[in-house]
């Protein structure tokens, strides 16, 4: 049976578990996958460019699961009431091809991107760091600030946009 995960579902998970748990648990999953990076069958993203934007397909797999992310970038979309970036993806069983999950990946990617940055900072920053600079305050900035707060204890932000 294929599960459908919507943006509302992801938001509800964050609300129910709380952002601290979501960010710290997600960091553990991201780290576990980085540690087994060589096990993944990776290829370069496939991009389809047009005069109005780009659509990219990003596949990856290991011996058990195949997944892809479909993401667009269309800068003029807000003029039509659409998001500049929208993403969805699928997860399937390699042995049978059975689709296990169809998921929104716009909000999920924002969470994962922030956690990946916090993971890198955890490895590179001084352990006593409590201040962060954010240059650019677009859609991703809030997720970055939250991940750095919950994962690294950042309590002071300097922002510039």
Where are these predicted regions, by residue range?
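N-terminal ligand-binding/catalytic initiation module
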Residues: 1-109, 116-118, 125-128
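Short helix-loop-beta connector
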Residues: 124-131, 153
